[in-house]
Design a protein with these regions (language model features):
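Canonical Rossmann dinucleotide-binding motif of NAD(H)/NADP(H)-dependent dehydrogenases/reductases
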Residues: 3-34
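Substrate-binding pocket helix/loop in short-chain dehydrogenase/reductase
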Residues: 104-105, 109-114
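Active-site loop of short-chain dehydrogenase/reductase
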Residues: 6, 61-62, 89-90, 135-146
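Conserved glycine-rich Rossmann-like NAD(P)H-binding loop of the short-chain dehydrogenase/reductase
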Residues: 30-51
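A short, exposed helix-loop element centered on a Lys and neighboring polar residues
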Residues: 128-129
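The beta1-alpha1 cofactor-binding region of Rossmann-like NAD(H)/NADP(H)-dependent oxidoreductases
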Residues: 47, 67-79, 110
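A glycine-rich helix->loop->beta "capping" turn
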Residues: 59-62, 82-93, 101
Length: 146
C-alpha cells in the first residue's frame, strides 16, 4: 500500500521509532504531522519537531511540526485540528509517544508512574479518540499503537 498523499498524525515523532516511521512514510510522499513536546534541542537526546520536519521533507514528504503534550486535551485537539486543516484530513494515527522508567517497581515513585500512565495509557487513548472523527472520513483509516 502506498502512502502517497496520505496524512499521518504521529505522536512522539521528533526522534526514534516515531521519526523512522515518519521518514519512511515521507519516502512514499505522505503528509506527516510531527506532534511532540521537543521544540528545543535536548543536551542528551537528538532531534526536535523542527529537525524531524526537515528530515521528512528531505525524504519527499510534507511535514507539519506541532508542539503537543499528549497529556493535555486542548493541545491534542488543537494539534489534530491543525493537521486536518492543513492536509485535508487524517488517514493514519500513530500513537508512538511514551514515557518509561528503567527502575524496578519498588524504586519507581508514584510521580514517575503517573507520568508514564498519563502518556502511555491516557495520552494514547486521547490521541486516538481525537483522531477518530477524521479517520472515519478516510478511505482506509488505521490506528497504530506502539
Amino acid at each position: 500500500m502506498s502512502l502517497k498523499g496520505k496524512t499521518l498524525f504521529i505522536s512522539g515523532a521528533s526522534r526514534g521509532i516515531g521519526l523512522a516511521i515518519a521518514v519512511r512514510a515521507a519516502r512514499d510522499g505522505a503528509n506527516v504531522a510531527v506532534a511532540a513536546k521537543t521544540a528545543e534541542p535536548h543536551p542528551k537526546l537528538p532531534g526536535t519537531i523542527y529537525t524531524a520536519a526537515e528530515e521528512i521533507e528531505r525524504a519527499g514528504g510534507k511535514a507539519l511540526p506541532i508542539i503537543c503534550d499528549i497529556r493535555f486535551e486542548e493541545q491534542v485537539q488543537a494539534a489534530v485540528d491543525q493537521t486536518a486543516a492543513k492536509f485535508g484530513g487524517i488517514d493514519i494515527c500513530v500513537n508512538n509517544a511514551s514515557a518509561i522508567s528503567l527502575t524496578g517497581t519498588l524504586q519507581t515513585d508514584m510521580k514517575r508512574y503517573d507520568l508514564m500512565n498519563g502518556i502511555n495509557a491516557r495520552g494514547t487513548y486521547l490521541v486516538s479518540r481525537t483522531c477518530i472523527p477524521y479517520l472515519k472520513k478516510a478511505a482506509n483509516p488505521h490506528v497504530l499503537n506502539l
